[in-house]
């Protein structure tokens, strides 16, 4: 069984290292972490979603019928859980 939280956290930190190396790396992403304050910008999130698509085999933002823009890590994680293949 996939541990989405673990996979997303690992990938999130990889992207953060590439796009914002001065920002701290997260041991754990808290559910209430505001994505705008996370250290990733819009390009970073695009890279994150693309890498997760490669690793998980799906992009929930392409699958969903109505666009949803998560504001917290919990909302981001839930989007992946709801659309999990």
Predicted regions, residues:
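Phosphopantetheine-dependent thiolation modules in NRPS/PKS and related acyl-activating systems
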Residues: 1-39, 44-47, 54, 58-85
């Amino acid at each position: 069984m996939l541990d989405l939280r673990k996979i997303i956290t690992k990938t999130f930190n990889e992207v953060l290292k590439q796009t914002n190396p001065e920002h701290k790396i997260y041991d754990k992403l808290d559910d209430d972490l505001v994505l705008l304050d996370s250290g990733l910008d819009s390009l970073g999130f695009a890279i994150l979603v693309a890498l997760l698509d490669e690793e998980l085999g799906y992009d929930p933002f392409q699958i969903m019928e109505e666009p949803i823009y998560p504001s917290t890590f919990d909302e981001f994680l839930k989007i992946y859980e709801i659309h999990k293949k």
